[in-house]
Amino acid sequence: MARKTLTTALVKKFIPSRKSKSRKGENGIVLVVGGSYIYHGAPILSSIAALRSGTDLVYTSVPKINVASTRSVSPNLIVIPLVDQKLTRGAVNKLLGALPRKLDSATIGMGLAIQEKNALLHLVKSLLDRDVRLSLDASALIPEVLPLLANKNVVVTPHAGEFKRLFGQVPSNSKNERIKLVEEKAKEFGITVLLKGSTDIISNGSTTYLYEKKIPAMTVGGTGDVLSGLVAGLLSKNRKPLESAAAAAFINGLAGKVVQKKLGLHMTSMDLLPEISTVMKPFDKIM
């Protein structure tokens, strides 16, 4: 098993070049599905993070009760209402009918209220059948989804509690044991696992990347939603789950370091969003 610590030089290889004559839509189209009556902000953070990663278009699907508040945050968001307040089979069918033909990646689960597990499974399977790369987080991390994901270009981004719910095992406090468990589960289920923590562990079961953040300000709520948007945004262009997840973790951390230096321990996740552009600019490559 190859293990590597993430560095700027390594991550630069994971960020694709952009053609000087490229057109709108050629640099990534992303779908974000999330939100609920209580957690309206999560998909907003993910969507703006995906845009800041350099994605051309982001479609944000939230319950209809959240549509006005989501649209009011940014004119850059293309909002598709979910017809029900929670994820149902009917809501998924209508969403699938409203999506553009070309869709590169999607992130699902941030703040999402799910009424029917089968609705989530239907959404995941339908997107995978369209060759859409997926990043699953939060509410989407349930064990029932695992049989659909094997070797399908999927990233899961759990924290320790979500890891337990998804895989049925608690990550150890021992760093080495955590790494081994992530590698084991990634290999067993044919997916890329990004276990969030003070050290992010990213593995596809054959290669593992480590990123030790040491950014205590990033315990604030919503940083994981930003990360999910970065994963989806990078996945829409790179299309390699391991590299995209590793780059997303690194960039999220770089942005966090910039914000912590400015604001100390008083940051919010919204503060990360403009800094994504700042820290990603040195990675830009134009062909």
Swiss-Prot record:
Annotated AMP binding lies at: K196, G197, S198, T199, D200, G224
User: What Enzyme Commission number does this protein have?
Assistant: 4.2.1.136
Presence of keyword Manganese: no
Q: What residue stretches are annotated with the YjeF C-terminal domain?
A: 7-283
Q: Secretion signal: which residues?
A: none
Residue ranges crossing the lipid bilayer per the database entry:
none
Specify one Pfam family: Carb_kinase
Q: Name one GO molecular function term.
A: ADP-dependent NAD(P)H-hydrate dehydratase activity
Name the InterPro entries for this protein: Carbohydrate_kinase_pred_CS (IPR017953), CARKD (IPR000631), Ribokinase-like (IPR029056)
Q: What is this protein called in UniProt?
A: ADP-dependent (S)-NAD(P)H-hydrate dehydratase
According to its UniProt entry, this protein's organism is Nitrosopumilus maritimus (strain SCM1)
